[in-house]
C-alpha cells in the first residue's frame, strides 16, 4: 500500500532549532543566538505563561468554554461577531479551514513568489491547483493590486501577505480593496497579517465588515510570543461565517492554547515591548549592517549578502543562527529576526565580519 501521489507537494522548511544546531556544532545551546524563525525575542506574554501553568491541570477537558470566550474576546477587539472568528491551531490551521470552505477539486489559487510555502501546500492538500505571481527584488518587493492582477486568471483564492515574509513589504489597504474589487465575485482575497502587530498600517479586517470576499489571517505566534502553543485565527465575512462549524477540526485550538490566548490579549504591555524592540532592532540593522537591507514592517530584516548559504553557515559556526533564504528563491540573501538589543548587536557584529 502507498499514499496518493504527493509529487506536487513540497516539504515545509522551517528554521533549525537551537538544540539541533548546538548538537551539530558541539556548542552549548545557551551560547547561541537564534534569529532564524521570527520568534518573539522577549518570550511569551507573561500573563500567558502564567495561564499555561494555572490551567495545566485542566488539560483533560475539551476547550469548549475557553474557545468560546476567546472568540468573543477577539470579536470585541476587531468589532466583529464571534462567529466571524475562526480559531485554529496556528495560522496554518486557519488556512486549511479557508481552503476546506472555498475549494472544490481543481479550483485554482494564486500565491506570491517568494512567499509562505503553506499557502500552496494547503491548496494542494485540498486538491486545488496553484499559480504564482512574483514579488520582485528588482522592484524592492513592492506589492500592488495591478502586479497581482497581471497573473490572475479567475482563481478561487488569492493570497496576500502583508507584511510579507521574507521581505517585510506591505500591500496597502487601498491596494487590497482594489484587488478585491477587480477580481471575480467568487474569488476570496486572503490577507495574511501574521506580522500585523509590527506594522503601522491599518488591518484589512476593516474591509471584512463591508464585503464578503476578503478574509484576514492573524496569529498569536509572533507579537504575543506563543509560537509553541499553536494558536491562530481567521476573521471572515459574516455572510458565510457559519461555515466554520462544518470545516473546523473539533477542538483543534487546545484548552492550554485558548487560555494562553485569552491571557495574552490581557497583556498589552508585552506586545508594546515586543513591537518597540523590533522597531529598534530593524533600525539598528539598517544603520549598522555592512550590506544592503530592505525596510521591513515585520520583526525581521532581509539582507543581501552575496552567498546566503555560505554566510548563514559561517554565522552559525560563530553562534548566530540566521535564515538562509535560498528556499524562498533568494540565494543571495539572509533573513535576520529582530532580537533583543544584545542579540541584535551580536548578530550585526558577526555578520559584518562575514560580508
For each feature predicted by the language model, list its residue ranges.
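PLP-dependent aminotransferase-like
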Residues: 101-155
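N-terminal "arm"/small-domain region of PLP-dependent enzymes with the aminotransferase-like
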Residues: 1-61, 146, 153-154, 234
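Conserved N-terminal alpha-helix of the aminotransferase class I/II PLP-enzyme fold
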Residues: 50-89, 281-284
Amino acid at each position: 500500500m502507498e499514499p496518493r501521489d504527493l509529487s506536487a507537494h513540497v516539504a515545509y522548511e522551517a528554521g533549525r532549532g537551537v538544540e539541533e544546531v548546538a548538537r551539530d556544532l558541539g556548542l552549548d545551546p545557551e551560547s547561541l543566538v537564534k534569529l532564524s524563525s521570527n520568534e518573539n525575542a522577549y518570550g511569551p506574554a507573561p500573563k500567558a505563561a502564567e495561564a499555561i501553568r494555572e490551567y495545566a491541570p485542566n488539560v483533560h477537558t475539551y476547550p469548549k468554554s475557553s474557545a468560546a470566550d476567546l472568540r468573543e474576546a477577539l470579536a470585541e477587539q476587531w468589532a466583529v461577531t464571534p462567529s466571524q472568528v475562526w480559531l485554529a491551531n496556528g495560522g496554518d490551521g486557519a488556512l486549511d479551514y479557508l481552503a476546506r470552505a472555498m475549494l472544490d477539486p481543481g479550483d485554482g489559487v494564486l500565491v506570491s513568489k517568494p512567499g509562505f510555502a503553506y499557502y500552496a501546500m494547503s491548496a494542494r492538500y485540498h486538491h486545488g491547483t496553484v499559480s504564482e505571481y512574483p514579488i520582485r527584488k528588482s522592484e524592492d518587493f513592492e506589492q500592488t493590486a495591478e502586479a497581482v492582477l497581471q497573473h490572475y486568471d479567475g482563481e478561487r483564492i488569492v493570497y496576500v501577505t502583508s507584511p510579507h515574509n521574507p521581505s517585510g513589504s506591505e500591500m496597502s489597504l487601498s491596494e487590497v480593496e482594489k484587488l478585491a474589487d477587480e477580481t471575480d465575485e467568487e474569488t476570496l482575497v486572503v490577507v495574511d497579517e501574521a506580522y500585523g502587530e509590527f506594522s503601522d498600517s491599518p488591518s484589512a479586517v476593516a474591509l471584512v465588515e463591508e464585503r464578503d470576499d476578503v478574509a484576514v489571517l492573524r496569529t498569536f505566534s509572533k507579537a504575543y510570543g506563543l509560537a509553541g502553543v499553536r494558536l491562530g485565527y481567521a476573521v471572515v465575512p459574516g455572510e458565510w461565517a457559519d461555515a466554520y462549524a462544518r470545516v473546523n477540526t473539533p477542538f483543534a485550538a487546545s484548552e492550554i492554547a485558548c487560555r494562553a490566548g485569552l491571557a495574552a490579549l490581557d497583556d498589552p504591555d508585552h506586545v508594546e515591548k515586543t513591537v518597540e524592540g523590533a522597531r529598534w532592532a530593524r533600525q539598528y540593522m539598517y544603520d549598522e549592517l555592512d550590506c544592503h537591507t530592505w525596510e521591513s514592517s515585520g520583526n525581521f530584516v532581509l539582507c543581501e549578502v552575496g552567498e546566503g548559504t555560505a554566510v548563514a553557515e559561517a554565522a552559525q559556526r560563530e553562534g548566530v543562527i540566521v535564515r538562509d533564504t535560498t528556499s524562498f528563491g533568494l540565494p543571495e540573501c539572509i533573513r535576520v529576526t529582530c532580537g533583543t538589543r544584545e542579540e541584535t548587536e551580536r548578530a550585526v557584529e558577526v555578520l559584518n565580519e562575514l560580508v
